[in-house]
């Protein structure tokens, strides 16, 4: 499944800046950054539930905003892409 993760973490305080770094690092570990606070993640249901749990443990619900969107498959029918962005093909072979 394709998940879109968006967040807006308050950075008014040192704790907020730490939360922002932790949320971004967590998203980077499982998905691909497409904008500053937007990630695309191709994951299964178990990974989705774990990601949601971990993200909710990081944010401050009084200060921050987190949105998780599950796109209907096939995602290619629901996502239109314009401009200069080079997506990584997670389904294809990995060259190191």
Swiss-Prot record:
**EC top class named in words:** hydrolase
For this protein, the Enzyme Commission number is 3.1.-.-
- Indicate yes or no for the key word Transcription regulation: no
Gene3D superfamilies, per this entry? 3.30.70.240
- Residues involved in Mg(2+) binding: 8
Q: Required co-factor?
A: Mg(2+)
Recall the GO molecular function terms of this protein's record: metal ion binding; RNA endonuclease activity
Keyword annotations for this protein, in alphabetical order, are: Antiviral defense, Endonuclease, Hydrolase, Magnesium, Metal-binding, Nuclease
Instruction: List, alphabetically, the Pfam families matched.
Output: CRISPR_Cas2
Q: Which SUPFAM superfamilies match?
A: TTP0101/SSO1404-like (SSF143430)
From which domain of life does this come? Bacteria
Which biological process terms from the Gene Ontology are attached to this UniProt entry?
defense response to virus; maintenance of CRISPR repeat elements
The cross-references to InterPro entries, in alphabetical order and at most eight, read:
CRISPR_associated_Cas2, Virulence_VapD/CRISPR_Cas2
Secreted found in the keyword field: no
Q: Return the HAMAP family for the record.
A: Cas2
Q: Which family does it belong to?
A: Belongs to the CRISPR-associated endoribonuclease Cas2 protein family.
The free-text function statement in the UniProt record for this protein reads: CRISPR (clustered regularly interspaced short palindromic repeat), is an adaptive immune system that provides protection against mobile genetic elements (viruses, transposable elements and conjugative plasmids). CRISPR clusters contain sequences complementary to antecedent mobile elements and target invading nucleic acids. CRISPR clusters are transcribed and processed into CRISPR RNA (crRNA). Involved in the integration of spacer DNA into the CRISPR cassette. Functions as a ssRNA-specific endoribonuclease.
* Binding partners and assembly: Homodimer, forms a heterotetramer with a Cas1 homodimer.
- Can you name this protein? CRISPR-associated endoribonuclease Cas2 3
Q: Which organism is it from?
A: Nitrosomonas europaea (strain ATCC 19718 / CIP 103999 / KCTC 2705 / NBRC 14298)
């Amino acid at each position: 499944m394709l998940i879109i993760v968006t967040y807006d973490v308050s950075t008014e305080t040192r704790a907020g800046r730490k939360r922002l770094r932790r949320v971004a690092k967590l998203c980077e570990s499982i998905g691909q950054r497409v904008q500053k606070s937007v990630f695309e993640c191709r994951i299964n249901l178990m990974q989705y539930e774990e990601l949601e749990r971990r993200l909710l443990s990081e944010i401050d619900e009084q200060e921050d905003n987190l949105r998780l969107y599950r796109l209907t498959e096939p995602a290619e029918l629901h996502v239109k892409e314009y401009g200069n962005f080079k997506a990584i093909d997670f389904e294809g072979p990995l060259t190191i």
